[in-house]
C-alpha cells in the first residue's frame, strides 16, 4: 500500500523568485514489485535541479514497502514522460525544454539499481534558449544559467533526441508493429 499518512518526500523551501507551479513534471511509473519512479519538475527554481539536497528537477525512486526515496536523475527541467520497456531493459524519459530544446533521454537502468545519479544538465546545458521576456527582464541570466548546447562537454548526458522548435513533448509510449 503506497498511501500513508506519513510523509515519504519532504519539500525544500529554498525556491527562487521565479517559482512557477506549472513546470512540475509528475509522471509516475512502476519500476518493479517494490519501486516506482516519479518525475518532479524544477518549478522554475532552476538552481535546484543541480542541488542534490532538493527534489526539484529530479526523478526519484520510491520504495513502496518502506517509503524511502532516492534521487536517480538530476538536471531535469520538466520531465513529462517515462516509458520502461521491461522486456528490453531500457527507460526513456521525455522533457520540456525552454523555448525549444524538448528532449528524449535514455536512462540507464543498471545505474538506477546501483544508486548512481545520472545528470542531464539543466540549467547549465540545453538545446533550448531562454525566453526573450526573461532575458529582457534579467540580461545576466546567461551568466548563471548558460544553456550550453553540448551536454557531454560539461559532464552531462546528451539527449538521444532534441526538438527545436519545441514540439510540446509529453508522455511516451511503445506502439506495436
For each feature predicted by the language model, list its residue ranges.
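Asp-box/WD-like beta-propeller blade repeats and closely related beta-sheet repeat scaffolds
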Residues: 2-30
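A broad detector of the eukaryotic-type serine/threonine protein kinase catalytic domain
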Residues: 14-17, 41, 45
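Generic structural signal for coil-to-beta-strand starts
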Residues: 34-37, 89-90
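Beta-propeller domain segments
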Residues: 42-177
Amino acid at each position: 500500500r503506497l498511501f500513508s499518512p506519513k510523509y515519504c518526500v519532504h519539500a525544500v523551501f529554498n525556491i527562487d523568485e521565479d517559482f512557477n507551479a506549472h513546470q512540475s513534471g509528475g509522471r509516475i511509473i512502476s519500476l518493479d514489485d517494490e519501486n516506482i519512479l516519479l518525475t518532479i519538475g524544477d518549478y522554475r527554481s532552476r538552481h535546484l535541479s543541480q542541488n542534490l539536497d532538493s527534489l526539484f528537477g529530479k526523478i526519484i525512486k520510491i520504495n513502496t514497502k518502506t517509503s524511502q526515496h532516492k534521487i536517480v536523475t538530476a538536471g531535469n527541467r520538466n520531465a513529462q514522460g517515462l516509458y520502461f520497456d521491461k522486456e528490453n531493459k531500457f527507460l526513456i524519459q521525455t522533457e520540456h525544454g525552454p523555448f525549444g530544446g524538448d528532449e528524449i533521454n535514455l536512462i540507464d537502468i543498471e545505474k538506477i539499481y546501483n544508486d548512481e545519479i545520472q545528470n542531464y544538465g539543466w540549467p547549465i546545458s540545453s538545446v533550448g534558449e531562454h525566453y526573450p521576456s526573461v532575458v529582457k527582464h534579467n540580461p545576466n541570466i546567461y551568466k548563471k544559467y548558460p544553456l550550453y548546447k553540448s551536454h557531454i562537454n560539461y559532464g552531462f548526458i546528451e539527449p538521444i533526441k532534441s526538438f527545436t522548435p519545441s514540439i510540446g513533448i509529453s508522455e511516451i509510449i511503445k506502439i506495436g508493429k
